[in-house]
């Protein structure tokens, strides 16, 4: 299993031209004496090719662009849904769901990533039905708040077709 931060960092590496950047969740730190403490530097490494990254972004954009009511106006986005059955440790049987939705925008040069995970949802069980509304709301606030410019190219209208 992985943490939400590990999952988000992995997806960011895939859509970021195939280059993984280790996540940093703190800006500064001090030791017990109030002295500044060194924070480990972010490391980077290539995890997939640039071409593979572009193909994954195309597929992720297709998830959003073919769904009605999902895109945020003026921004091309990409997303991946997730739905998993939970295993009950007492009976070792399936009991309930974990639903998720991870979105990146703008898809042509990702700047913002949102990852929403709902444990034991009560209003459905698919990532699209349960987690997507919160991810969309977060993204619609974060994009303008952090000064991310709208997409200049329009998303393709036709669905993506696999070409081996």
Task: Give the positions of each predicted feature.
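Short, highly charged C-terminal tails/helix-capping segments
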Residues: 149-164
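Active-site beta-strand/loop architecture of penicillin-binding DD-peptidases
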Residues: 1-43, 51, 60-149
């Amino acid at each position: 299993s992985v943490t939400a931060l590990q999952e988000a960092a992995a997806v960011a590496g895939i859509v970021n031209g195939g280059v993984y950047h280790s996540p940093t969740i703190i800006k500064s730190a001090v030791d017990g004496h109030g002295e500044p403490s060194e924070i480990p530097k972010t490391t980077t490494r290539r995890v997939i090719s640039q071409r593979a990254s572009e193909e994954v972004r195309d597929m992720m954009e297709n998830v959003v662009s073919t769904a009605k009511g999902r895109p945020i106006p003026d921004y091309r986005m990409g997303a991946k849904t997730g739905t998993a059955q939970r295993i009950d440790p007492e009976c070792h049987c399936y009991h309930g769901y974990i639903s998720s939705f991870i979105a990146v925008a703008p898809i042509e040069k990702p700047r913002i990533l949102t990852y929403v995970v709902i444990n034991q949802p009560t209003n459905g069980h698919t990532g699209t039905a349960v987690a997507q509304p919160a991810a969309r709301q977060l993204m619609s606030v974060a994009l303008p708040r952090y000064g991310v410019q709208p997409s200049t190219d329009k998303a393709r209208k036709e669905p993506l077709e696999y070409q081996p």
